[in-house]
Amino acid sequence: MTTQKKVLGTYSAGSNHWVGDGFPVRNLFPSNGVDVDPFLMLDYAGPSRFEPAKKPRGVGEHPHRGFETVTIAYQGSVGHRDSAGNSGVIYPGDVQWMTAASGVVHEELHEAEFTKNGGIFEMVQLWVNLPKAQKMSKPRYQGITKAQIPVIELEGGGHARVIAGELLGRLGPAKTFTQVNLFDVILKAGERFELPLPDGHNAAVVLRKGDVLINGTDTLSGEALIAPLSEEGDAVTLEAKADTQLLILSGEPIAEPVASYGPFVMNTHEELAQAVEDYRAGRMGHLA
């Protein structure tokens, strides 16, 4: 018998702000006080229209240490280049999973053709914490294509994409340091889906767009909302009142101290000071 994870609240995203000149984002957490350990932050960008341009928009060279960035492209395309020698482009449906760990410098810019032609841009960026034991490990880059992500067709006509973790026997392609589940879920109007999630995981239902009833009690309706869920319980029931686009995340809590400063997330303020010093001294490398 399944036990539903409790809805801990419902929250709308913060006001729109720009990251660089290419990403108009709304923050879903932690700006509203939501804590979903091991996840640190979730920004939702778009949908926004960009006019054709000659120069790629985005965020230029900047550092990270101590965590992972996960970027999911829904519309538009983004190029990535980092000081560890990794580069790639993610197109609609693709995922970029970058492990900053001991430190990288990277840039994120609109891809050349998207820059030239313009169009609708929509993406999500999620920050995933690393345990203390892995914070200074070697940086890693996973460019995951749409074709590599398993798709589960649901009985009501919707589907679920398994980006990380396991759902209904299907394993996601992303390699993670701790137990993390990340699912893209599309539900058709009138569809009901009881989604299993591990007992002991923190979790959240993120609404990109639509109207969904959670566990028969709480509603997310509109665009860019989040409902954090309890650790206790092993399922969440989703009922779509309209065509609905969701992102479901769950993870085993790391439960370690978190010290953050801008692009660095460590365990102590001393480690943050060292990260700043290492970056300024060029120890995280430079873009060629």
What do these predicted ranges mean?
Residues 1-288:
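Jelly-roll (double-stranded beta-helix
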